[in-house]
Amino acid sequence: MICFIPTKGRLNTKTYKLFEEAGIEVKHFIEPKEFDLYEVPNKINIQKDNQGISYVRNFMLQYAKENNHQWIIMCDDDINSFYEYRNGKNIKVGADVWINIFQKANQLPFELYGINNKQLIWTAKQDYVINKASVEACILMNVNKIDWNYSKDTKEDKDFALKTIKEGNGIVKFLKIGFSTPTVGSNKGGLHEKYKDKQDYKWAEKMTKKWHPYTKLYKTNKKVDVKINYKAFAKSLNKIIK
């Protein structure tokens, strides 16, 4: 198992240190224009600038296959900690929590394994769900089982989750383990400018049409997003649901 971190505009990223402390190897995937600016270990040049997050995710998948990395953790560059909900409390833990997840995943048939947002782990009624939710920000992937790619200009992680349910066995999400990051779109770098420019609104609309009738566009004063009924989608395909 190895951790892949795509990074852009965040020269001070420290996410890799969480994994180093847990003894998990890390590689950073960086655009050519910023490659020499980063002082992080194990840098990989992704060959093209400004191609978006789907491009780099697909680049990492291909890199993993070409270099015989069956299990990868694909982790955002602004993850700053991990937590577990135990005995009524959020307990800060190390990235070695992914070693525990891997040991379980290695015995299971699914392609994607993810965790919750720290802010939500206290609400979990069960330890995990299967094919009822998407996973994002930090994901364990069984690359050997994946022969589909990320789509461009969409809610790429949710879209990839639906593809995984459709084309593969699906997704396990551990609800009482969580990651912590800055507020989405508030941390300069990454997709920050696209969030500011409201591109995510267009992506939500596009995805709603693509995956109808299992999607619904919803609007609040602050955002437009897509609500997805993963359970109904999985059920329509006779996939495992738990």
Each PLM stretch: what is its role?
Residues 1, 7-11, 152, 158-242:
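C-terminal catalytic/acceptor-binding lobe
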Residues 2-24, 34-38:
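Short, well-formed alpha-helical segments that are part of the catalytic scaffolds
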Residues 9-10, 34-35, 78-80, 118-121, ...:
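Short, solvent-exposed loop/turn segments at secondary-structure junctions
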Residues 28, 71-75, 111-116, 171-175, ...:
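A structural signal for short, well-ordered beta-strand segments and their strand-loop junctions
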Residues 82-163:
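Conserved catalytic core of nucleotide-sugar-dependent glycosyltransferases
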